[in-house]
């Protein structure tokens, strides 16, 4: 079951998107996310401030 779920996830990525992610088309392979610019300390504070 787990293998099938992993395969379904891979099917949703197009070949051009995969090339971009892996850096095969001259890209860096980096996908910028909301956490890309954030400091680890900021995330640690968010997840530990109320515990």
UniProtKB/Swiss-Prot annotation:
There is a cross-link at residues 33-38 (Beta-methyllanthionine (Thr-Cys)). GO terms for cellular component: extracellular region. There is a cross-link at residues 35-49, 42-50 (Lanthionine (Ser-Cys)). InterPro entries: Lantibiotic_typ-A_Lactobact. Coiled coil: none annotated. GO terms for biological process: defense response to bacterium; killing of cells of another organism. The keyword Chaperone does not apply. Keywords: Antibiotic, Antimicrobial, Bacteriocin, Lantibiotic, Thioether bond. GO terms for molecular function: signaling receptor binding. Lanthionine-containing peptide antibiotic (lantibiotic) active on Gram-positive bacteria. The bactericidal activity of lantibiotics is based on depolarization of energized bacterial cytoplasmic membranes, initiated by the formation of aqueous transmembrane pores. Lacticin 481 is a broad spectrum bacteriocin exhibiting activity against a wide range of lactic acid bacteria and C.tyrobutyricum. Belongs to the type A lantibiotic family. This is Lantibiotic lacticin-481.
């Amino acid at each position: 079951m787990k293998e099938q779920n992993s395969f379904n996830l891979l099917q949703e990525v197009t070949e051009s998107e995969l090339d971009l992610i892996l850096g095969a088309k001259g890209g860096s392979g980096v996908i910028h996310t909301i956490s890309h610019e954030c400091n680890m300390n900021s995330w640690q504070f968010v997840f530990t401030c109320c515990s």
